[in-house]
Amino acid sequence: MASTATVAAGQPASRYAIESRYAWLRLAVSLTIMTIGGAGMYAVPVTLPAIEAEFALARGAASLPYTVTMIGFGLGGVLMGRVADRFGVLVPLVAGGMALGAGFVAAGMAPGLWAFCLAQGLLIGLLGTAATFSPLVADTSQWFDRRRGIALAICMSGNYVGGAIWPPVMQHFIESAGWRQTYIGLGVFCLLTIVPLAWLMRPRPPALVTTPQVPGSTAVRSALPMGLRPRTAQALLCVAGVSCCVAMSMPQVHIVAYCADLGFGAARGAEMLAVMLGMGIVSRLVSGWISDRIGGLRTLLLGSVLQGIALLMFLPFDGLVSLYLVSAMFGLFQGGIVPAYALIIREHFPAAEAGARVGMVLMCTLLGMALGGWMSGAIFDLTGSYRAAFLNGIAWNALNLAIVLFLLSRVYAMRGRLGRA
């Protein structure tokens, strides 16, 4: 679809039109930046055993850096999204690259837990990784219309590409050089890559267009999204985001420590995390393709059911080979959940409100990851095993499933009323 907007002085609008060649190039740059910035999310799970040993921490306390990172990540997504809305995506990306560089160096030199948490939460989470996530998701949604689902899936796959790359790379350098040197080197790398790439994102997006109706989608154009008041619908999506990600965080945050406790070693756990997130890339892309055909709510329902099944599979199986298989299954089943929220909002809410609403729901998913990471560690400290933590994740996943089913029932009821009118 051609846009009539001219987004760069002296350049014809068609060059920077929606779904143009430049839009796909921009998507590739967004994917690369999100992959690099994802190091901020996956550094702590890999370094958790080393931090626990060096600072003499209990498992719950050792999980605290991940929790503050995800809280900062969530709050920073809203903050950086507003900065991007006002100044363009270039400003938060440059600031984020500099913050990641400073944050990893500061964390690598931290004398104790609280200094480490401060660097993780403020520089890496709030100002760093957050700038490479929500602003890029919102930016991508403005460059695509008919292929918005797959475009969002590709963009947000950077989160999982980073998860597939960073754990084994970091584990290698932690074993050979130590976690502190690994952090410092990672900070230098982020600074030297993200800031130059950000300059390729200077053109502003073309004018927003109306989201097209997806064949088979549950979207119904109404002043009442999903048959509910806007605040109620938004609140339910936020609670759903928290609950699905509390469940999702248990294997992602604790699989390395879980494998170490089982006697397989942290390196095997890092490999399982990489497998899990690598399969998440496949899941995210396939789910994006599916969502362009069945809509966001049905895609979220499918992901919620499959994630619950995968979590159940962790309970009876704790052998090395079986854990590799279950980790792959978990990654393959849950990768499409978070992108579905962005698509649901674009389908059921006005386009002019999409940026703020997407940022809020993504913040809640990240807060869910933070809560789940801490909660699983605390449950381990109380019970001495991860079985209760897995059961806790399954319960939160059931809450997510119940909310999605309720929203779908409201949509179908509203469609029925409109059909009889």
PLM feature spans:
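Hydrophobic core of transmembrane alpha-helices in multi-pass small-molecule transporters
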Residues: 35, 103, 115-131, 242, ...
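Structural signature of the two symmetry-related core transmembrane helices
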Residues: 91-105, 298-313
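Extracytoplasmic
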Residues: 25-59, 80, 166-167, 250-256
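Interfacial helix-cap and linker-helix signal at transmembrane-aqueous boundaries
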Residues: 51-52, 83-84, 165-177, 259-260, ...
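Conserved MFS/SLC helix-loop-helix module at the cytosolic interface between two early adjacent transmembrane helices
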Residues: 75-114, 291
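Helix-loop-helix hairpin linking two adjacent transmembrane segments in secondary transporters
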Residues: 155, 159-205
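Extracytoplasmic gate region of multi-pass secondary transporters
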Residues: 44-48, 231-289
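Cytoplasmic helix-loop-helix junction between adjacent transmembrane helices
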Residues: 120-157
